[in-house]
């Protein structure tokens, strides 16, 4: 049994090292003019960049958007430590307290509602700094995104039958 375990560990390490060597050979540096990948933070956030794609914003508009987003960021708060601990306590308790969990969820829903309201207000402020032509393009982009169905993450594309 010891030999089998040793063989397994040795082969795992060897394959892991081979994968690392292969990964090091195939990595390429990003082009100098490439846009950084936008996960959750960036110029305007994950979806704001798409929201303003092809609008040809002026520098003044970009600055106004930055200021609006900075104000929004200051308002958006992470759930308080007590709420996160309360949620953790519910999850890790020996028995599930449904009443306590529902009360915690209600609290979290209130906070989410307030955050969504602030988010929509921010988007409205940004929309209202656009020129009429930019608003027209913005609405066209919105309609285009509604009709284009994005591929489901992590799922295989449907095969044609």
Curated annotation (Swiss-Prot):
InterPro entries linked to this entry: Cpx_auxiliary_protein (IPR052211), LTXXQ (IPR012899)
Major subcellular site: periplasm
Cell compartments where the protein resides: Periplasm
Bias type Basic and acidic residues, positions: 142-151
Gene3D superfamilies for the chain: 1.20.120.1490
Source species, domain of life: Bacteria
Transmembrane segments: none
Molecular-function GO terms, alphabetical: unfolded protein binding
GO CC terms: outer membrane-bounded periplasmic space
UniProt entry keywords in alphabetical sequence: Chaperone, Periplasm, Signal, Stress response
Pfam families the UniProt entry points to: LTXXQ
Function of the protein: An ATP-independent periplasmic chaperone, decreases protein aggregation and helps protein refolding. Binds substrate over a large region.
Family of this protein: Belongs to the CpxP/Spy family.
Swiss-Prot/TrEMBL domain comment: Has an elongated cradle shape.
NCBIfam families the record matches: PRK10455.1
Subunit structure comment from the entry: Homodimer.
Protein name: Periplasmic chaperone Spy
Source species: Escherichia coli (strain B / BL21-DE3)
